[in-house]
């Protein structure tokens, strides 16, 4: 018997909606990253994108434990000398609530073209409304 290898054209992708209200950031992000990769499926193949589409609502209400609301710092650099920019979790969740979850999930996905394709299947919204009703997403309880 030969080892099964999934082909990109035969992969069936489902749409799921996840409510992030009150969920811990890291635990939620790791489960979402695993589902974007397709690791929950029997036909998972590492070099093929077998994951599902994930819609996350209420990203502004995601929780962090301990003092991370004030202490967790996000860094970025402009590539110019002295161009290091920092922002705390508290300020980032007030300014761009979607970005917190997007950065957490993106860091858990592979680097390269396959990881970027997986990341594009993640849709994050700050509030309860999303514009993917036509895809008939199923509710996923994480």
Curated annotation (Swiss-Prot):
Gene Ontology cellular component terms for the protein in this record: cytosolic large ribosomal subunit
Coiled-coil positions: none
Alphabetic keyword roster: Ribonucleoprotein, Ribosomal protein
MF (Gene Ontology): mRNA binding; structural constituent of ribosome
InterPro entries reported for this sequence: Ribosomal_uL13, Ribosomal_uL13_bac-type, Ribosomal_uL13_CS, Ribosomal_uL13_sf
Keyword presence, Ribosomal protein: yes
The keyword Ribonucleoprotein belongs to this UniProt entry's keyword annotation: yes
GO BP, one annotated term: negative regulation of translation
Superkingdom field: Bacteria
NCBIfam families: rplM_bact (TIGR01066)
Protein purpose: This protein is one of the early assembly proteins of the 50S ribosomal subunit, although it is not seen to bind rRNA by itself. It is important during the early stages of 50S assembly.
PANTHER family hit by this protein: LARGE RIBOSOMAL SUBUNIT PROTEIN UL13M, RIBOSOMAL PROTEIN L13
Quaternary context: Part of the 50S ribosomal subunit.
Membership in a protein family: Belongs to the universal ribosomal protein uL13 family.
Protein name: Large ribosomal subunit protein uL13
Name of the coding gene: rplM
């Amino acid at each position: 018997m030969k080892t099964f290898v999934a082909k990109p054209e035969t992969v069936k992708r489902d749409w799921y909606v996840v409510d992030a209200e009150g969920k811990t950031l890291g635990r939620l992000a790791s489960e979402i990253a695993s589902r974007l990769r397709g690791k929950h499926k029997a036909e998972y193949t590492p070099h093929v994108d077998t994951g599902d589409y994930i819609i996350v609502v209420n990203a502004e209400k995601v929780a962090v434990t301990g003092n991370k609301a004030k202490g967790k710092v996000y860094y970025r650099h402009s590539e110019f000398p002295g161009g290091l920019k920092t922002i705390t979790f508290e300020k980032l969740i007030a300014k761009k609530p979607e970005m917190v979850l997007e950065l957490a999930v993106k860091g858990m996905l592979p680097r390269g073209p396959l990881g970027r394709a997986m990341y594009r299947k993640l849709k994050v919204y700050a509030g309860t409304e999303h514009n993917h009703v036509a895809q008939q997403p199923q509710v996923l309880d994480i």
